[in-house]
A protein has these predicted regions:
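Proteolytic maturation boundary segments
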Residues: 1-89
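M16 family metallopeptidases and their MPP-like homologs
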Residues: 1-3, 70-103, 107-159, 169-179, ...
Length: 184
């Protein structure tokens, strides 16, 4: 026989009307307003290392290298000098956590969960990073999802999201790691 408190719980539950779970899916596009494209200001080919360099109208320098490793994958890395080395002592810990916070917060109007739903079945990802000397973004995409990758890159720089719930979740994980570190 079940203990009395479990029997009461089952009796209470049997009287409740419980609605089925309805998944909330955002139907808006990732990037609602496509920005005006820039132009290529200059191009140069380096035959000795088989790369092409373009300087864009916004000053960004792009170096392209084709390989025969994987025909269905485009990998990128974007960076600028700086990293932890330019942080004040007071901001160092915050700076070290910044990339993780950005990664957990989603992009534009999309939480990280909404973004995962949008990206289901697609091959596109971006990850911000900060190390000792550089900060930047890395990622990859299939050729079919290249436009989506460019939208994600654009949003990383123009519409990074501040998500208090994601921040609280990440802080809980960090606290747990610190508490468990003393046990090992």
């Amino acid at each position: 026989a079940l203990p009395i408190y479990l029997t009461k719980v089952f009796e209470k539950i049997s009287t409740l009307t419980i609605d089925s779970y309805v998944d909330k899916v955002i139907t808006e596009p990732l990037l609602p307003n496509i920005p005006t494209p820039g132009t290529v200001a200059s191009e140069k080919h380096y035959a000795d290392i088989d790369t092409d360099e373009m300087v864009l109208s916004n000053g960004v320098r792009v170096v392209l290298k084709s390989t025969d490793f994987k025909n269905d994958e485009i990998i990128f890395k974007a960076f600028s000098p700086g990293g932890f080395s330019v942080f004040s002592d007071e901001d160092l810990m915050t700076g070290k956590m910044a990339a993780n916070i950005m990664d957990y917060s989603g992009l534009g109007n999309f939480s990280v969960i909404d973004l995962q739903k949008l990206l289901a079945g697609k091959q596109a990802s971006t990850t911000p990073y900060i190390n000792s000397l550089y900060e930047g973004l890395r990622g990859s995409a299939s050729p079919n999802d290249l436009e989506l990758l460019f939208q994600m890159i654009h949003l990383q720089f123009t519409a990074s999201r501040q998500d208090a719930e994601a921040f609280a979740s990440l802080m809980t994980q960090f606290r747990s790691q610190l508490e468990n570190k003393s046990l090992s």
